[in-house]
A protein has these predicted regions:
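Compositionally biased terminal segments of proteins
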Residues: 1-138
């Protein structure tokens, strides 16, 4: 089994997109937008390549349609650039990671039918976004 290594390093090209939320106390809180949160999760998959990042991504994607996630992630290159010369665009690399998630720490997880079933669900959600990203690119 081939294991994807963590990414070469990415640089943020633009400020973080935020929105303001009013708390019940009357205070206001500035938080990343939903799209920005999804981009953060994609960035973490590319930079750390951990099973936890894939699981968090899958949980977030479960709250939206894969096509919605794909539309956001297809524009990753406007927000992040790869620091290593000659590397593919981040969105292209992310499609590959999502299509075949192979986190660097996968062997560290406890074996068992329940853990395997959970991981297969994570893989399924990631793949659905990768396919939708390819459709978006057409």
């Amino acid at each position: 089994m081939q294991t994807h290594r963590a990414g070469p390093g990415y640089r943020r090209r633009s400020p973080v997109e935020t929105t303001n939320v009013a708390l019940p106390t009357g205070d206001r809180l500035q938080i990343p937008t939903g799209a920005e949160t999804l981009r953060f999760k994609g960035y973490l998959i590319m930079s750390r390549n951990s099973s936890h990042d894939y699981a968090d991504f899958a949980d977030l994607v479960d709250t939206m349609a894969p096509e919605t996630a794909a539309a956001v992630l297809a524009g990753m290159d406007r927000y992040y650039s790869c620091q290593a010369p000659g590397r593919q665009w981040m969105a292209t690399q992310l499609v590959g990671r999502l299509a075949d998630p192979q986190p660097s720490d996968l062997g560290d997880q406890s074996p068992g039918a329940d853990a395997q079933a959970k991981w297969e669900e994570v893989r399924r959600r990631c793949l659905s976004v990768a396919v939708a990203m390819l459709e978006e690119a057409r």
